[in-house]
Each structure stands twice: as C-alpha cells, then as structure tokens.
Amino acid sequence: MIDLRSDTVTIPTTEMREAMAQAPVGDDVYGEDPTVNALEERVAEILGKDAAIYMSSGTMTNQVAVRTHTEPGDEILIDKNAHIYFYEAGGTAALSGVMCSLISGERGVFGAKEMEAAISEKEPHTTILRPVDLHLPRTKLIC
C-alpha cells in the first residue's frame, strides 16, 4: 500500500534514497532545478494547462488557493469538518485574513440545500443575498 498522507509517516526505501542522491539539482526559485521543472511540465501536460507549480504541502496549496481567490475581510463557505478548518492551525485567518463559515455536509460534500440552510441561519448577517455591508464579511469562495 502507498500511504500519501504525509512524507512524515513513510520511510524511504534504499532505492528511493539512491534516486534522491543521484537526482540532478538546482535552485527551483530561479527555475534552475531540472527535476522540479520536469515535474511541473509533466503535470501541466497531464492536466492540459499552460503551466503548473510545485508546492511542498497540501496545507501550503490550500492556503495559496484561498489567498488567490480572496482578500482580507472575506469569508469562505466550507464543510464543518474540512481539513482547511481543523488541521491548518488557523492559517486561513492568520495568513489571508479570511473567516470560515461552516456548512453541514456529508464527508466534505454539500449542495444547494445545505448552503440555503446555512444562509438562512445567518440572515441578515450574510452578504450572499444582500448588498455589501462593511460590517459583514464578503462571501468569496465556496470550498
């Protein structure tokens, strides 16, 4: 079985260590790491995109995605058990200045019915159905 939860729960095999030692290296910040460049090019090709970017963790990826789509003072709607809410040390608030509004879904999946229920519970404290009010967060992202 391959465990992809984290590199902290697996032990590299001898072959993996040898591959790491033999891999060509460079500075990925300056686009000089051939291994990272090849990975990004391959992923972009697989996904049919112009480019891809390698990020070192799922947490980093989540936070970059939130920050890309929001501004400080915004709100995101997420499932009440979302990883981004429970296991990222408040990164959404700390790094992006964004608050999370929780929705009751089923294993991270929620639909229009659950969103409507969440909105009804917050009325009139939501900007989803009302004009922007500087006292309320702007809903910008549904995760």
What residue spans do the PLM features occupy?
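N-terminal amphipathic/basic leader segments beginning at the initiator methionine
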Residues: 1-19
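Conserved N-terminal alpha-helix of the aminotransferase class I/II PLP-enzyme fold
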Residues: 13-58, 79-81, 85-86, 91-93
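Generic secondary-structure signature for well-ordered alpha-helical cores
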Residues: 9, 21-26, 45-48, 97, ...
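Structural motif
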Residues: 2, 51-54, 74-76, 99-101, ...
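PLP-dependent aminotransferase-class I/II
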Residues: 96-142
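Membrane helical hairpin/interfacial module
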Residues: 62, 72-73, 77-80, 96-99
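Glycine-rich loop at the start of a catalytic domain that most often binds anionic cofactors/ligands
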Residues: 64-73, 91
